[in-house]
Amino acid sequence: MYIKNFITLLKRYTTSSLLNIIGMSVAFAAIYLISVQVRYDLSYDKVIPNSENIYRLESPNRYEEGKWSYHWNRQWPDEMCSGVPEIEASGSIWIYAADAVDFSIKRNQTVDNLKIVMSSAEPEGLEVFPFEFVEGGLEEFRLAKGIIISEEIAKKYNLKVGDFLTVGRSLESGYELNIVGIFKNFPEPSNISACEGWINMGSQQNAQINNFNDPYYVRLNEGASHVEVEKKMNANMIEAWKKEGKSEEELEHLVKRYTVRLNPLSKIYFDELS
């Protein structure tokens, strides 16, 4: 009966009925697209296992009042984290995708050119995030010329642990990097999922202490209070500055400039202050 009435109305008011149907279809499509986008936004970086315990180390932005910066030198963050029992892992790592890097590899008598989106990290930085290796691992990554690549890239270019990639096209540079690990791709949506490989940042001893350029992340024990950890980290840094012989005036400036906060990984996507 309902179908019969619908057909009757459709025949009598064809144009208006079709417009209503089209309008409702567009409305439902819009609602669907909005719900997909909302779900995407709300799950961003939360899809990373243990993301609720991972934080980015930040300090007040010196150029914009009320905002925060996440660039650090290679030395201070480790001093801040030293001896804090709630910290399971910590280190410098870039989890944002950079430009693709040109590589080349010689196979038999041919040279293949590849492009891989690379980031950089120190081994301790990689340990903050839940890398799952299908081949190799982080043991050899500590070597100066060790790199790790994603499983997707390994399959795309038919690469394996032990292969040497030359930086640049057509073997021009002669500078080789050794693939020491192949990891499972991280789930999306997340920043880290866009990175296809990591190269070792190199030794802290060779890094300039006044070079504030690298992000630093920490992973806390389950149930740990990041606010309490912040207090301990700040206390560690103040003690280190005192040992360096900083004056009261210098200490006041440094505390104001570098009092830290731990920004949850799951909230960074929406954070407009950093």
What are these regions (language model features)?
Residues 5, 20, 29, 33, ...:
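Amphipathic alpha-helical recognition patches that constitute DNA-binding helices
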Residues 24, 95-99, 268:
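Short active-site-proximal "capping" loops at secondary-structure junctions
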Residues 31, 35-166, 170-175, 231, ...:
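Structured, solvent-exposed hinge/loop segments at the ends of secondary-structure elements
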Residues 119-135, 149-274:
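Mid-to-C-terminal secondary-structure elements
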Residues 2-13:
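A short amphipathic helical element positioned immediately N-terminal to and/or at the very start
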Residues 13-40:
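Short, strongly hydrophobic transmembrane alpha-helices
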